[in-house]
Structure formats: structure tokens, C-alpha cells
Amino acid sequence: MMTRLTLFILLIVGAGCAAQTAAPPDDTPAARGKVAFEQRCVPCHGAQGRGDGYPFLKPPPADLTAFAVRNKTDADLLITIRHGHPDTAMGSWRFTLTEKEIWDVLAYVRTLQK
């Protein structure tokens, strides 16, 4: 009987320890940016960022995985996110996203390019 009680107590204590050591939620800029990207950018840029969202846009949305976008500086991409891109459907996000969210989206876009 004592062995069963000891085993039971060890299981309860072990379960409590396991719950405390669970990994915290991913709160990196790229993880936060992914959430914003999924909410705001996927309709046009597509789930993988390849510009395959709305097929009827002319010109089509940028393929964020393309070599041309990979070679742009962070400053260039931040300007595009903040202010949009002339003569395209890419509008300004500066009044919708906070500055932190814009940087987070940029961090996520950079992960699409690897």
C-alpha cells in the first residue's frame, strides 16, 4: 500500500513539474509578425507570401520570396509597408498597424525568404 501511495505522489508531483516547464508561447517579432501577416497580408500575398492571393490584381501582388524582394533593404520594405506602393493594390498600413507591428511583419517576411 505504501508503494502505491508513494508512486501516486510521485506521479502528481511529476505532472506538476512538467506543466511548469512547458515552453512559453513564441513571442518573437517573427511570430507576432506572422499573426499580423495572416490577418492582413495573406489575402493578396498568399499564405506563403508568393503573391498568389487575389489572382485578378493587376499588377499582381509582390512575391515576397522572390530574389528582388530578398535584396531590398529593411528600410525599403518598411517604407512599402508603411506607405504602400504606387500604382498597385498595396496600400498604406501606417494607420492600421502600429510601428512595432510593422517591424514584426518585416521580421516575418524575412523568414519567408529563407
Regions found by a protein language model. Give the residues of each.
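Detector for the c-type heme attachment site
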Residues: 18-19, 44-50, 82-83, 110
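Electrostatic cytochrome c docking/interface patches
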Residues: 17-36
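Positively charged n-region of N-terminal signal peptides that target proteins for export
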Residues: 1-5
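Short, surface-exposed glycine/acidic/tryptophan-bearing loops
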Residues: 53-55
